[in-house]
Amino acid sequence: GDWSSDVCSSDLNVGDHGTTIKLYLKDNTDDENYDEYLDQYHLQSLVKKYSDYVHYPIVMDMTVSKKKEDSDEYEDVVENKTLNSMVPLWKRNKREITDEEYNDFYKDKFNDFNDPLKVIHSRVEGTVSYDALLFIPSKAPMNYYSNDYEKGLQLYSKGVFIMDKASELVPEHFRFVKGLVDSEDLSLNISREMLQHDRQLKVIADKIEKKIQSELENMLKNDRDKYLEFFDNFGLQLKFGIYNSYGMLKEKLQDLLLYYSSKEEKYITLAEYVEKMPENQKEIYFASGETLDKIAKI
């Protein structure tokens, strides 16, 4: 059949490539101040929080105060500023990252004054691929053994921030670990409710637990002084992990525990104690108490 159209042709001014999206804010209410989304520093902080590591530059005209040339007066100047970092630290080759870069990132990201005791940077590819950048703090936070402390890792999907404390990513006995996970395989729309049932997240969590366990075992074996520092801060957490699981985690965690030897006057593992037992000794001798001083008086 015949085809006809009533549309009249007209000139079209084609500008630069791209799409213009205009957002209109609601009027302020007693409960919400929508004007804050017009504040350049608030917008900058939102971009840093949620989109700091997307692959493309997010640029905004920002008004800054600058000193006039040959004058003590200041003037407002509009500058084109890229707000996001684009390349996240955890996506870079770890051989090219300095200890200082890791330390600065940790202190800035997790509000700690101290350098981390241990950095665990891994990239895993397989059925579920992800990057993980984990830190063991050098000191237990002030609120660590209180109900106020929240465990969990920051969660990113394709460099976009999803949530701050994904508790499902780290087991209770390793709750001291801070850090983040970024996976290309997770949905950007994943919610806290969905986390508990997400199969891919369960795979990531299992691999992270094994990685932390392996790193602690290596530290115990190859850097005893550093491990002693770790155990002084978080050894109680490992003991509680065994106790709280009614012994189910005993096989997994027992080799990470240290005990003070009155004979050797230092901390040793159970395996080290057994190895040095005389052949005719059939029992393990121990005393328990709140402090070494109190035990010594028994």
Where are these regions (language model features)?
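Conserved GHKL (Bergerat-fold) ATPase module
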Residues: 1-298
